[in-house]
UniProtKB/Swiss-Prot annotation:
Homodimer. This is Biotin synthase. [2Fe-2S] cluster binds at residues 142, 202. Its EC number is 2.8.1.6. InterPro entries: Aldolase_TIM, BATS_dom, Biotin_synth/BioAB, Biotin_synthase, Elp3/MiaA/NifB-like_rSAM, rSAM. It comes from Citrifermentans bemidjiense (strain ATCC BAA-1014 / DSM 16622 / JCM 12645 / Bem) (Geobacter bemidjiensis). [4Fe-4S] cluster binds at residues 66, 70, 73.
Length: 328
């Protein structure tokens, strides 16, 4: 297995690619072979994207009462959880959060809203906030506003949005087990519309939903076909009141193996570890960078708390990682 892993890394660095069958086979590595996989992912990462780490932060700008029935989500109106419920926050609050993210060293700041989409006055308010963030900070703003079309993407871009975030969440073959209120193709179409508008796309998913290892590979190959710019990787933090409240936690080793395989499938992309990092990786959080990740979210998530920012910044320094600074 060590020879196979090394051969795959050499092939990728030389401009080739890993096959689906090889990627699925790598999901089964155990023992010391896991470290061979991590070494290969690190070599590929350093060849294609270097040794810098990209930091991002978000604001939950509109929370709760979402009509979608995503099995993992605390904000779904189909679930009874303790997640906060409030309308779209004012632009001043978005701007203040962007400034805080900038102070903490994030290069990207995401405005995230619950619900299927945004339009009308809400969209106009977000457009105004984007213009102010661009004018009054150096941070790059992104948005995650649900399913949108090319015209909306162009409006957001003109207002200053750098990247649009829209997760596929899981593989197409598993999606009906997670969400039935919209089709997988709606998400794929959103990614394509945003790309057509000339906007960078941040698109990934969440692991530990009950999907198979092969389905994790399936989603990675879909992301490769869509040619997304960055891939956020979340790991399920089961929330009481959701359909997945009793789901078994994904192991730390499974998290790291999945990151490594995604690096081999998506060698030149930004791979950012986001939600569930603290819950699932615990003392192994720093290992994400040895498994192939080159980004992480700092601060809090949508409905769960993140780790202390200073603790994360110390971790990056201890690892000798250089953080990417904000720049328009």
């Amino acid at each position: 297995m060590e020879k196979m892993i090394n051969d795959i890394a050499h092939r990728i660095i030389a401009g080739g690619s890993i096959t689906e069958a090889e990627a699925i086979q790598l999901t089964q590595v155990q023992g010391t072979e896991v470290y061979d996989l991590f070494r290969a992912a690190t070599r590929v990462k350093e060849h294609f994207v270097g040794n810098e780490v990209h930091l991002c932060s978000i604001i939950n700008a509109k929370s709760g009462r979402c009509a979608e029935n995503c099995a993992f989500c605390a904000q779904s109106a189909h679930h009874k959880t303790d997640a906060p419920v409030y309308p779209l926050v004012q632009e001043e609050e978005m701007l203040a959060s962007a400034r805080m993210a900038e102070t903490n060293g994030s290069a990207c700041f995401g405005i995230i809203t619950s619900g299927t989409t945004v339009n009308g006055p809400e969209l106009e308010q977000i457009l105004t906030a984007l213009r102010r963030i661009r004018k009054e900070t150096t941070i790059l703003p992104s948005c995650s506003l649900g399913i949108i079309d090319e015209e909306t993407a162009r409006k957001l871009k003109e207002a200053g949005m750098d990247t649009y975030h829209h997760n596929l969440e899981t593989a197409a073959s598993f999606f009906p087990q997670i969400c039935t209120t919209h089709d997988y193709q709606d998400d794929v179409n959103t990614v394509r519309a945003v790309k057509k508008a000339g906007v960078k796309v941040c698109c990934g998913g969440i692991f530990g939903l009950g999907e198979s290892a092969a389905q994790r590979v399936e989603m990675a190959l879909t992301l490769k076909d869509l040619d997304v710019d960055s891939v956020p990787m979340n790991f399920l933090n089961p929330i009481e009141g959701t359909r997945l409240e009793g789901a078994a936690n994904i192991t730390a080793q499974e998290c790291l193996k999945t990151i490594a395989i995604y690096r081999l499938i998506l060698p030149g992309k930004r791979i950012t570890v986001c939600g569930g990092r603290e819950k699932n990786l615990r003392d192994l959080q720093s290992w994400i960078f040895f498994a192939g990740a080159n980004g992480t979210m700092i601060g809090n998530y949508l409905t769960t708390l993140g780790r202390n920012v200073d603790t994360d910044l110390t971790m990056f320094s201890d690892l000798g990682l250089k953080t990417v600074m904000c720049a328009h």
